[in-house]
Amino acid sequence: MSIQNEILNAIASRRSCRAYKPEQITAEELEAVTTAGTWAATAMGRQSPVMVAVQDKETLAELSRLNAAVMGTKSDPFYGAPTAVLVLGEKNNPNGVQDASLVMGNLLLAASGIGLGSCWINRCLLYTS
């Protein structure tokens, strides 16, 4: 590609990570990543997705257990990451999945941009009535 810039390089170099250091990320790092999520494009500018950051080990373990029960597996969907950011889309919003997906994209790029590993965990997707 003949055009090079910081954004295109970040997009091209981002990779999924499935092995994490046990050290917790800093509040500043978490804020940087989630702020990028809030800047994601959304249909009609609704900004409807909600991000929930989970750093408590017991809560992460419970979320992992619940996911394993739904998926019929015992593996940790978060690969031992000390932080998980759940992105929730509105069930009745016809663009909810797309809006949440755009937020996820921003989260992944922001994490990569500041040197953090990240991975889209689609297995956590669960529709409830």
Feature annotation, model-predicted:
Residues 109-113:
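Short hydrophobic alpha-helices that are characteristic scaffold elements of the AMP-binding
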Residues 15, 89-91:
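Short, histidine-centered active-site or binding-site loop motifs used for metal coordination
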Residues 127-128:
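Conserved small/polar residues in nucleotide/adenosyl-binding loops
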Residues 84-88:
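Active-site-flanking beta-strand signature of metal-NTP-handling nucleotidyl enzymes
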Residues 114-123:
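Glycine-rich phosphate/pyrophosphate-binding loops
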Residues 92-98:
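Short pre-catalytic strand/loop immediately N-terminal to key active-site residues, enriched for Gly-Thr
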Residues 1-83:
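N-terminal amphipathic, basic helical "cap/leader" segment at the start of enzyme domains
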Residues 101-103:
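Charged helix-capping and loop-helix junction motifs
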